[in-house]
């Protein structure tokens, strides 16, 4: 019973712990301006590149991280079919030593 009487909120006006001037967002930040993220489009579809050449090291390096890992689709914006072809081309280039398997230390 004693706990119920201690936790009663004041009924007059707004509570002092919450500012009423700005509403907060879902993650605790200010509910301000939302950033617009442009939809990523497949580079190979827009340029109508059908076959991805495994010898084009400059093109393939754009899709390999500096540690040597293949960058995922959600970061590059490449469509599913071209991501598969790109992965195959990167692996071929690695096997004939055009691209490194891992980064230098």
Curated annotation (Swiss-Prot):
Gene: rpsR
Protein name listed in UniProt: Small ribosomal subunit protein bS18
Listed Low complexity bias regions: 12-25
Keyword RNA-binding found: yes
Annotated GO biological process: translation
UniProtKB keywords: Ribonucleoprotein, Ribosomal protein, RNA-binding, rRNA-binding
Protein family per UniProt: Belongs to the bacterial ribosomal protein bS18 family.
UniProt-annotated stretches for the region Disordered: 1-34
Polar residues composition-biased segments: 1-10
Pfam families named in the record: Ribosomal_S18
Subunit-level organization: Part of the 30S ribosomal subunit. Forms a tight heterodimer with protein bS6.
Role, per record: Binds as a heterodimer with protein bS6 to the central domain of the 16S rRNA, where it helps stabilize the platform of the 30S subunit.
GO cellular component term of the entry, any: cytosolic small ribosomal subunit
SUPFAM superfamilies per UniProt: Ribosomal protein S18 (SSF46911)
Gene Ontology MF terms in the entry: small ribosomal subunit rRNA binding; structural constituent of ribosome
